[in-house]
A protein has these predicted regions:
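Short loop/turn motifs at secondary-structure junctions
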Residues: 6, 103-104
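Charged alpha-helix within mobile-element recombinases
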Residues: 120, 126-211, 253, 258
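A short, conserved beta-strand element enriched in hydrophobic/aromatic residues
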Residues: 50-100, 106-115, 141-142, 265-267, ...
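Short beta-strand or tight-loop elements
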Residues: 45-50, 65, 239, 248-250
Length: 285
């Protein structure tokens, strides 16, 4: 009985497959991570490391996820905001307020976790796509390599030791602790790595002003413009290769750089290359 039942199962699947009625599981594409560039800064606002320090509960049982942003050159702690989760809808307003207050950095350096990045091509996420629209380079450190953001991690250890052991009684009280720590860290505490100076003595606001309205991308005349569909695909000749649903409705640029090889560009960011013969996309960082 078992063998007959199994044979019947195979026959049914063969029939469904023959008539294209059988949904096959698609293997999820994994993208190689080429690693982050070394950090070299000689003035403020070239690179801002950012991260979520590990979550914890305040005394009333509410979760707190501290979002932190520093300036690599001066070591200044630009923001430390306790949030109830790591959702983009909560993190993006913190970055927007910071950009409005002090301007834009050249680059933001993070790990590969939410909401900063995803497992898709170029780690595209709603947050880093917004950064690209603002002309900010997103540097993603190598997975499981926190030492590539080591300076920021050392600040986190001090933050944890001085503000969360034990945690405050409520999120509001915890935020007050964060603000006290930030003032001391920036204004009172000399740092050996910057010649025993304080971060606030070296840091200055950025000259790059946050634009309230983001201009659409403008590509050179030789670049072919394609709009990403709601399904995350774009047109290449008669084909519709998949790119990313994060970019749905956005205009990308296709630049032919070889025999049937095209660069895929979004604003000034090279997302990858596609071979028009195989439709295989090779990602970049």
């Amino acid at each position: 009985v078992g063998s007959l039942g199994n044979a019947g199962y195979r026959t049914l699947n063969d029939i469904l497959d023959r008539h294209k009625l059988l949904r096959k599981n698609r293997r999820r594409r994994t993208w190689a991570h080429p690693g982050a560039p070394p950090v070299k800064t000689d003035h403020p606002n070239q690179v801002w490391p950012a991260d979520f320090k590990g979550q914890f509960k305040t005394g009333d049982g509410q979760y707190c996820y501290p979002l932190t942003v520093t300036d690599h050159f001066s070591r200044a702690l630009l923001v430390c905001r306790g949030l109830p989760s790591v959702k983009t809808a909560l993190a993006q307003p913190v970055f927007r307020a910071l950009f409005r207050e002090v301007g834009l950095p050249d680059a933001i350096r993070t790990d590969n976790g939410a909401p900063f990045a995803s497992t898709g091509i170029h780690g595209l996420s709603p947050l880093n796509v917004w950064w690209m629209q603002l002309g900010i380079v997103h540097q993603r450190i190598t997975p499981a390599s926190p030492q590539e953001n080591g300076q920021h991690e050392r600040m986190h250890r001090e933050l944890k030791r001085e503000t969360t052991r034990p945690a405050a009684r409520s999120p509001r009280a915890q935020q007050s602790r964060f603000e006290v720590f930030r003032r001391r860290y920036n204004d009172e505490r000399p740092h050996e790595a910057i010649g025993d100076r304080t971060p606030s003595s070296l840091w200055t606001p950025s000259t790059r002003v946050y634009p309230e309205c983001i201009a659409p991308p403008v590509y050179p005349a030789h670049v072919e413009v394609r709009r990403v569909s709601s399904a995350g695909t774009f047109r290449l000749h008669a084909q519709q290769p998949f790119l990313s649903q994060v970019l749905r409705g956005e205009d990308i640029g296709l630049e032919e750089v070889g025999d049937g090889i095209w660069n895929i560009v979004y604003y000034s960011t090279l997302l990858g290359k596609i071979d028009e013969r195989t439709l295989r996309i090779t990602g970049t960082q």
